[in-house]
């Protein structure tokens, strides 16, 4: 299940550089993090849902690659983002 429009709009307001910024690395990572956190509740209830687990792993890998890119290019923004999101890095 995807995120609601209100949640997405709040993430865009919190992490976007501008009003219509949907493609910056910070916004993409924040959206993926919210979706990953949302799916964790699903997996507590549906332990054997392996098809959705594959999608979750794809999201985690995508987020990992985006974070590696951000760390390589703009380390200050990377540090700020992981602090805001509470990621263990």
UniProtKB/Swiss-Prot annotation:
SMART domains on file: Ribosomal_S15
Gene3D superfamilies from the UniProt entry: 6.10.250.3130, S15/NS1, RNA-binding (1.10.287.10)
This protein's UniProt keywords: Ribonucleoprotein, Ribosomal protein, RNA-binding, rRNA-binding
Any one Pfam family match given in the protein's UniProt record, by short name: Ribosomal_S15
PROSITE patterns: RIBOSOMAL_S15
Domain of life: Bacteria
GO molecular function: rRNA binding; structural constituent of ribosome
Database matches in InterPro entries: Ribosomal_uS15 (IPR000589), Ribosomal_uS15_bac-type (IPR005290), uS15_NS1_RNA-bd_sf (IPR009068)
The keyword Nucleus belongs to this UniProt entry's keyword annotation: no
This protein's record includes keyword Ion transport: no
GO biological process: translation
Gene Ontology cellular component terms for the protein in this record: cytosolic small ribosomal subunit
Protein family: Belongs to the universal ribosomal protein uS15 family.
Function: One of the primary rRNA binding proteins, it binds directly to 16S rRNA where it helps nucleate assembly of the platform of the 30S subunit by binding and bridging several RNA helices of the 16S rRNA. Forms an intersubunit bridge (bridge B4) with the 23S rRNA of the 50S subunit in the ribosome.
Quaternary structure and interacting proteins, as annotated: Part of the 30S ribosomal subunit. Forms a bridge to the 50S subunit in the 70S ribosome, contacting the 23S rRNA.
Protein name, per record: Small ribosomal subunit protein uS15
Gene that produces this protein: rpsO
């Amino acid at each position: 299940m995807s995120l609601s429009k209100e949640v997405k709009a709040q993430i865009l307001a919190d992490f976007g550089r501008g009003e219509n910024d949907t493609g910056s690395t910070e916004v993409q990572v924040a959206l993926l993090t919210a979706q990953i956190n949302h799916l964790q509740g699903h997996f507590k209830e549906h332990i054997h849902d392996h098809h959705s687990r594959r999608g979750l792993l794809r999201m985690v890998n995508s987020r990992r690659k985006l974070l590696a890119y951000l760390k390589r290019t703009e380390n200050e923004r990377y540090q700020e983002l992981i602090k805001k999101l509470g990621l263990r890095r």
